[in-house]
Amino acid sequence: MLEPLLKHLHISSILRFKDYLPPPNIMADVRNVIIIGAGPAGYTAGLYTARAMLEPLMFAGYASGGQLMLTSDIENFPGYPEGIAGPEMMVDLRKQAERFGLEVEDKNVEKVDFSSRPFKVTVEGEEHLANAIIISTGADSIWLGAEGEEEQKGKGISTCATCDGFFFKDKTVAVV
């Protein structure tokens, strides 16, 4: 499984990489990479690790896409000059990564054990082993609970200064 990849690496890289591999008797059950989270970072990791022939497995969770699934217009992502709806962009990212071999399971990770190699990822009571774990679980907004906040989301109340700051250029704003 790794031999085609290893033959192109410098010998010092191979020796360092092999130090982290589990014993040969359990190699068949060990993934090279498990990705936890299915937003833009997760799918980018999936795309690149799949193209590197590392046979990645992604656990996307039951609500993959994160905050972008609630975003109607994304205008600051390269490749979409007219903007794109968040859910549509997530479909595009998933399709592209899967085209190169990313395996996606829409399941939630319950636990990760980093105490020894290979690492253990528990999903719905089942243990998965991997040499590397990429955690790309994203972020979540913290709301104040202020009066009128819910009604004004997306109409002047924003949770992403770098995303929405452009819309408030030359205006008076409050940042909490």
Question: What label would you give each PLM region?
Answer:
Residues L47-R51, G61, K169-V176:
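Rossmann-like NAD(P)H-binding beta-loop-alpha module
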Residues E55-G61, L68:
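Short beta-strand "acidic-cap" motif of Rossmann-like dinucleotide-binding folds
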Residues A41, A63-S64, D140:
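Conserved Rossmann-like nucleotide-cofactor binding loop
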Residues G46-L47, L70, G145-G148:
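Short amphipathic alpha-helical segments
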Residues M69-E127:
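N-terminal Rossmann-like dinucleotide/flavin-binding domain of flavoprotein oxidoreductases
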Residues M1-L2, L6-H8, S12-L15:
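N-terminal amphipathic/hydrophobic targeting modules at extreme N-termini
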Residues S13-R16, L21-I36, A52, V104-K171:
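FAD-binding core/adjacent interface of flavoenzyme oxidoreductases
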Residues R31-L57:
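N-terminal Rossmann-like FAD-binding beta1-loop-alpha1 element of flavoenzymes
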